[in-house]
């Protein structure tokens, strides 16, 4: 009550921010007349002037008004578009490291030019982050003429680019890239064997488009680069045969309740658990198969991997459905993104789940991979010096953006009032009844020539609805993961009078649905259109546009509520752009997943009884509250999951940063001999301490064991026993000093044989190779620790604190191993000539390159030839030429 009163008097935080920024908009507007008088050359010279002023100590904020006025004027001349005042506000919000919520159709692409230009003046590079290759290419080509007019270089970074092209892309002032490619390039840079192989500069400013999709929906997806591990194909096939013998149980066993099933399912977290009865049954089956010995337990340390396979197979069979979570395409399992409905070619589930699904579907089982490098989007984007984002739907997740990324959300007002009619939800008893009502609504729209976009939550649902529409004789197009290649074309046609388009979730997001159809797309299909053809296309479009406007604009039908209100708002947001008319309605049933999973059986039964007739629809405020309550539960559950992930990943992140800093130092430094000398002393002191404890008497020493250790580990044959017999005054300190000095002298003798330069290169190579190998093993160990740490909760211990403590101990142990391994290799290496060392170094590099050639990045793309690029589309390499005149011509003749 008090908060509402204060807001009524002083306005909300958002209102106060907008009032402050409106004053700055007025200052930019006052410059417009002055900048209109400038010649093109004078306007272009502003870039050099701003850079000079920055070099002399000016701040970006002090240049903002003039820089924005420059971009606005250049846009009018080059693109024929003038930034609205609300777009100037959006640009300032993005400059101030915030998230701008701008409704669909309000011109986010043009708004982005303002902060991009301003931040690019520093010369440190700007990354504009998009969710897919198509949007990266499209936005870069849209804004390229404007940026190049102002003297800025523009490039595109997408999967499949040659290394030299990718390196050039990162050197551009403004680089458009996909979120996954940026993350993978960061990981690849930290697997590079020389500084010349790296791609990225220090991360300066990132502007994330569709920020909610990248920083929230994909936050729990780690970016992983992996290499091949041992083959376990036969085990996956054997375990797959076990699952049909197991029976599901409704709930977990407790002291009061013991079920008669073998496993339970947690639908929220998509996890499966064996009951005690199920464990015994599985052990008996595996023993008969010869995979276990009589009397052995699945929880025996030697059999834990089998338990891991059983759980993966259970999840594959009982929790992951074909055409919902994945599709089978060309004999491979292709994941479907649950948030966008798009396929994610190249991505694989971890923890053996992908192989278990391959076994279930009877396709070729590809080998498991070992993690070589990984990072989450949460931690990658927090590496940027400045981070900002924009989307049409962020306000519902404002708390999470602030908590995790420190980003405030500012809702930008629309340029024209929003007049879309959002109708109340209709609830039906069953799915068939709901589909009948949807078909009736679609038929009404077609009769008045109103285009309809129907949103579904999965491929399975979209195909079921498509089948129902076919039976009703309604022509329509389906936009889902199976038809990804035609996505832009289907979206372009979705605004035609009476057009019916079914879309999974937010497939096609980022592309506006233009009422009457996309006339620009029609013109783009023509090779060299004449002015007469262009005028004819525009005239026909205007006729169609008027028909659609009169019919009520684009009508949105949601066939199911999503887990998140934000995704529902995104679907609605496709209609009513820039003051256009539009309408939306959600059709629900008690069979919907949201209802079944998040409402208890009592509530569902009560709601079923409320329906008295078949086909009856329920419409009430109470219903809206029930749905909102279910969605709030899911959002809270998902937020908690992302927060938990971050808390655990933050531990690994500190270690990752330390290792990558050390690695970068090694790549940048030619001479690490001082480091090697320090490490040598540390290692020898640690070894000697084990056999000759500090400040101890001679009777406590184990000299023969020390002699043996020095020989085995460092190739040093030292007669320490004889020294002690011959020299009475040889005490602990002098003995320690002598051993370390001899080690140094032997090493210096080797260096004299091959030369200092070769030895420095060899030291660096050995250090890098050991660091990479041990870090890879450490990542696997951390994965295992993370998976089992929750069990500490049963011992009344805080799992997070235990994870921190144990992972730190593991990290310290890894560093000790690194030091010991490096000194051992450098001490034992036998060199007779410079040529031998150079040959050893060449072999080491060849081995490293061979290993890296097997690395696989989840979500990595393909070569240009597989990207389905139109001949007249811009080339994805970022050259600015048409594809047919650039890499397209090379592809044609290669």
UniProtKB/Swiss-Prot annotation:
<dbReference type="InterPro" id="IPR011115">
    <property type="entry name" value="SecA_DEAD"/>
</dbReference>
<protein>
    <recommendedName>
        <fullName>Protein translocase subunit SecA</fullName>
        <ecNumber>7.4.2.8</ecNumber>
    </recommendedName>
</protein>
<dbReference type="InterPro" id="IPR027417">
    <property type="entry name" value="P-loop_NTPase"/>
</dbReference>
<dbReference type="Pfam" id="PF07517">
    <property type="entry name" value="SecA_DEAD"/>
</dbReference>
<dbReference type="GO" id="GO:0043952">
    <property type="term" value="P:protein transport by the Sec complex"/>
</dbReference>
<keyword id="KW-0811">Translocation</keyword>
<keyword id="KW-0653">Protein transport</keyword>
<keyword id="KW-0862">Zinc</keyword>
<keyword id="KW-1278">Translocase</keyword>
<dbReference type="InterPro" id="IPR014001">
    <property type="entry name" value="Helicase_ATP-bd"/>
</dbReference>
<dbReference type="InterPro" id="IPR020937">
    <property type="entry name" value="SecA_CS"/>
</dbReference>
<dbReference type="InterPro" id="IPR000185">
    <property type="entry name" value="SecA"/>
</dbReference>
<feature type="binding site">
    <location>
        <position position="886"/>
    </location>
    <ligand>
        <name>Zn(2+)</name>
    </ligand>
</feature>
<dbReference type="InterPro" id="IPR011116">
    <property type="entry name" value="SecA_Wing/Scaffold"/>
</dbReference>
<keyword id="KW-0997">Cell inner membrane</keyword>
<dbReference type="GO" id="GO:0065002">
    <property type="term" value="P:intracellular protein transmembrane transport"/>
</dbReference>
<dbReference type="Pfam" id="PF02810">
    <property type="entry name" value="SEC-C"/>
</dbReference>
<dbReference type="InterPro" id="IPR014018">
    <property type="entry name" value="SecA_motor_DEAD"/>
</dbReference>
<dbReference type="InterPro" id="IPR044722">
    <property type="entry name" value="SecA_SF2_C"/>
</dbReference>
<dbReference type="InterPro" id="IPR004027">
    <property type="entry name" value="SEC_C_motif"/>
</dbReference>
<dbReference type="InterPro" id="IPR001650">
    <property type="entry name" value="Helicase_C-like"/>
</dbReference>
<keyword id="KW-0963">Cytoplasm</keyword>
<dbReference type="Pfam" id="PF21090">
    <property type="entry name" value="P-loop_SecA"/>
</dbReference>
<dbReference type="Pfam" id="PF01043">
    <property type="entry name" value="SecA_PP_bind"/>
</dbReference>
<feature type="region of interest" description="Disordered">
    <location>
        <begin position="836"/>
        <end position="870"/>
    </location>
</feature>
<dbReference type="Pfam" id="PF07516">
    <property type="entry name" value="SecA_SW"/>
</dbReference>
<keyword id="KW-1003">Cell membrane</keyword>
<keyword id="KW-0479">Metal-binding</keyword>
<feature type="binding site">
    <location>
        <position position="887"/>
    </location>
    <ligand>
        <name>Zn(2+)</name>
    </ligand>
</feature>
<keyword id="KW-0547">Nucleotide-binding</keyword>
<dbReference type="GO" id="GO:0031522">
    <property type="term" value="C:cell envelope Sec protein transport complex"/>
</dbReference>
<keyword id="KW-0067">ATP-binding</keyword>
<comment type="subunit">
    <text>Monomer and homodimer. Part of the essential Sec protein translocation apparatus which comprises SecA, SecYEG and auxiliary proteins SecDF-YajC and YidC.</text>
</comment>
<dbReference type="GO" id="GO:0008564">
    <property type="term" value="F:protein-exporting ATPase activity"/>
</dbReference>
<keyword id="KW-0472">Membrane</keyword>
<dbReference type="GO" id="GO:0005886">
    <property type="term" value="C:plasma membrane"/>
</dbReference>
<feature type="binding site">
    <location>
        <position position="87"/>
    </location>
    <ligand>
        <name>ATP</name>
    </ligand>
</feature>
<dbReference type="GO" id="GO:0017038">
    <property type="term" value="P:protein import"/>
</dbReference>
<comment type="similarity">
    <text>Belongs to the SecA family.</text>
</comment>
<feature type="binding site">
    <location>
        <begin position="105"/>
        <end position="109"/>
    </location>
    <ligand>
        <name>ATP</name>
    </ligand>
</feature>
<feature type="binding site">
    <location>
        <position position="512"/>
    </location>
    <ligand>
        <name>ATP</name>
    </ligand>
</feature>
<feature type="binding site">
    <location>
        <position position="877"/>
    </location>
    <ligand>
        <name>Zn(2+)</name>
    </ligand>
</feature>
